């Protein structure tokens, strides 16, 4: 199944770390969409992929009707919780590092640079701006980070005899099967978009700030996931992916985090609109018509300002890199 969020096509490809290309005119995209076209014509791809709402998509996943999907894990986690609550662990998902080209490594675990496109502001009407800043400062403290991620000591977590911060089996089970767990308890509910440490960061006691640490993830695996670990002979499900050490760290923020000039933003919106219509036509066309549909899409993208958008995005990237040097 394809998540309807593919309507938001604003993704760019970076070649040789200096050149930016609009994704749907970049190398490799034609092969990918030709594969989708083949799956559509074979009846494997959901025929409603282009018309369903996000709610439709999530409901299908939650009902165990979707064999495989292309999506970010955070977007379907709630549906997986529903599957576990219904005893349908066999219908949950394990990520696979699949790429169209075997020579290309799946970069899911690649370490990203700091995203600095968003900021924090204090309004003129704030009655106590000093207190507001102190609150933001407190959010970065161990006390606040533990509260946001773990909850209240003695209620949501405890320390064992070795000083390890733990949650009960009941809470672990609830966090995996209750879709309202975070909202009901407050645990993890306000971590994003506030300041937070990475999953492997530890506090002054040596315990992880996050409940998504390697150790906590392993403790939370269900029986189906444990069977996969055994079959793949790995310690964690992510061990089958290329590890972050296999990639160089980019010297720039993720492009989605950059603030774009209004004119460039409008150009990208126009390209997105052309892409959404044209990609649907490519995917649902008879196989013999795919090449012609793809060529038509590429010409329409050029007419919509593709080359200018690529140049301006490349200039933004190079400016970002130069500021960090």
Residue spans for each PLM region:
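Single conserved hydrophobic/aromatic residue that forms the stacking wall/gate
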Residues: 1-10, 14
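Glycine-centered hinge/linker elements that transmit conformational signals in sensory
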Residues: 18-47, 97-101
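Conserved small-residue motifs centered on glycine
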Residues: 146-284
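A bilobed periplasmic-binding-protein/Venus flytrap-type ligand-binding module shared by bacterial periplasmic
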Residues: 115-128
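Alpha-to-beta junction loops
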Residues: 62-74
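Short helix-initiation/N-cap motifs at beta->coil->alpha
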Residues: 50-59
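Short, solvent-exposed loop/beta-turn-alpha elements that line the ligand-binding surface or hinge
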Residues: 15-27, 101-110, 159-183, 314-325
